[in-house]
């Protein structure tokens, strides 16, 4: 209704995009977020959320571009840096992803999500001991969530037969 009254109401387009995302209607979410950005091109939250939705759609290059554009304009946007690392990992660029994650850890200490992200990239690269060590550190900080993520994460598929991995996630 708000969009009918004012088609240039960026917040209404953003909210519509969020709702579409929650309904797993990602193409429609992107369309609404694009409309929001047409109304308010400088809205960082909308641009960021657009990157998140592209990531959910497995459109990792587009997601990466969203996060890189945010970082160019807002070089201290740590969430954009983190998600840039995630998208690099999804594209198989694990060394670059780990470089980003290491920089975040230098600034923000032992963030459990970042430690987990480094673990999964190490698993994907075959650095089993390091992956398991970091996974163990992450599990110590957030047992329930990290175990669930690790079990479902394809980056850890190569570790499914590893006794230490099975022990960590049971």
Regions found by a protein language model. Name each.
Residues 1, 22-35, 56-69, 91-103, ...:
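Structural signature of tandem alpha-helical TPR/SEL1-like repeats
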Residues 123, 128-145:
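TPR/TPR-like (Sel1-like) alpha-helical repeat modules
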Residues 145-170:
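Terminal, low-structured helical/coil segments at or just beyond the last alpha-helical repeat
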